[in-house]
Swiss-Prot record:
Residue sites binding ATP per the record: P97, M98, G99, A100, G101, M102, G103, G104, G105, S106, S107
Keyword Nucleotide-binding: yes
Keyword Kinase on entry: yes
MF-aspect GO terms: 4-(cytidine 5'-diphospho)-2-C-methyl-D-erythritol kinase activity; ATP binding
Reactions accelerated catalytically: 4-CDP-2-C-methyl-D-erythritol + ATP = 4-CDP-2-C-methyl-D-erythritol 2-phosphate + ADP + H(+)
A single BP term in Gene Ontology: terpenoid biosynthetic process
Protein name, UniProt field: 4-diphosphocytidyl-2-C-methyl-D-erythritol kinase
Function, as annotated: Catalyzes the phosphorylation of the position 2 hydroxy group of 4-diphosphocytidyl-2C-methyl-D-erythritol.
Cysteine pairings via disulfide bonds: none
UniProt KW keywords: ATP-binding, Isoprene biosynthesis, Kinase, Nucleotide-binding, Transferase
Signal peptide: none
Species of the source: Polynucleobacter necessarius subsp. necessarius (strain STIR1)
Active-site residue list: K14, D139
Length: 296
């Protein structure tokens, strides 16, 4: 094990290539099927080991109390679980929009667990980190899992899936969406027929729908506006929403004029954010972990 004083790791976003709601548990949690694709739209997490027995966030998000800050919660959860004597300073550089349906907060929490497991020399397994991550949010275990996945249950059942890594056009229409506002809506489809992983791999083009999209479009008109922008920018594409929104995306093929597309992005409505991003096959946080020969 390498002894570290500090660590900087990238926290990637994800896209839901499709999202089906297939049922609901008695406790109210929804059962889903989805394919999660990692993308190279990343936050950067800086962790510095300190002797004080405290978790300190250097640049807290305005308006977010520490008890609601996922990276602080993740650090304290791990610290308490291992009864670790010592602390950390956390500096998070945000690039992934909040409330975008791309898992930015969950990814940051996962990277905090991954990074502190190394920084504090805890030697916890991925399975243990995933179990801890699930206490923070349904998407956190996916980012700890670290590979593209066919996801089921409430998000805790994952099977690695081999995906191509194309370019994507992603637009965030500057509208944060609270997941609860979508999943509590009475018009949300909750009985989508289940599919198999083989069914998806055989005919992926048949599975490009998001059951949350119709509800989001009705409540948040910016979602439809963003979908219309992508349709205009990439004619013939099949844009859809990621997660519970509000980000929308389209897969780009090799014929897409990327330079022209980037010019298009400069003319988005004020406050909107758009990027051309590349799909990933692995959480980049693990690239540094592997380089440092830290086992997980």
């Amino acid at each position: 094990m390498v002894n570290l004083d500090s660590l900087s790791l990238r926290s990637p976003a994800k896209l839901n290539l499709f999202l089906h709601i297939v049922g609901r548990r008695t406790d109210g949690y929804h059962l889903l099927q989805s394919v999660f694709q990692l993308i190279d739209w990343c936050d950067t997490l800086h962790l510095k080991r300190i002797s004080e027995n405290v978790v300190r966030r250097i640049n807290p998000i305005p308006g977010v109390a520490p008890e609601h800050d996922l990276v602080v919660r993740a650090a304290n959860l791990l610290k308490d679980f291992c009864q670790f004597e010592g602390g950390v300073e956390i500096n998070l550089q945000k690039e992934i929009p909040m409330g975008a349906g791309m898992g930015g907060g969950s990814s940051d929490a996962a990277t905090t667990l991954i990074g502190l497991n190394a920084l504090w020399s805890l030697n916890l397994s991925k399975e243990t980190l995933c179990a801890l991550g699930l206490k923070l949010g349904a998407d956190v275990p996916f980012f700890i899992f670290g590979k593209n996945a066919f996801v089921e249950g409430v998000g805790e059942k994952m099977r690695e899936i081999s995906l191509e890594t194309p370019d994507f056009l992603v637009i965030f229409p500057n509208r944060g969406i609270a997941t609860a506002s979508i999943f509590q809506d009475p018009e949300l489809t909750r009985d989508h027929a289940q599919i198999t992983i083989d069914g998806f791999l055989t005919s992926p083009l048949l599975y490009q729908s998001n059951d949350c999209q119709a509800v989001a479009m009705r409540i948040y008109p910016e979602v439809k506006q963003a979908l219309d922008w992508i349709t205009q920018a990439v004619p013939g594409s099949q844009p859809r929403m990621s997660g519970s929104g509000s980000s929308v995306f389209a897969v780009l093929d090799s014929k897409t004029d990327i330079a022209k597309l980037k010019n298009f992005l400069q003319n988005l409505p004020k406050g909107w954010v758009g990027r051309v991003v590349r799909g990933l096959n692995k959480n980049p946080a693990y690239n540094l972990i592997s380089f440092l020969q830290i086992d997980l």
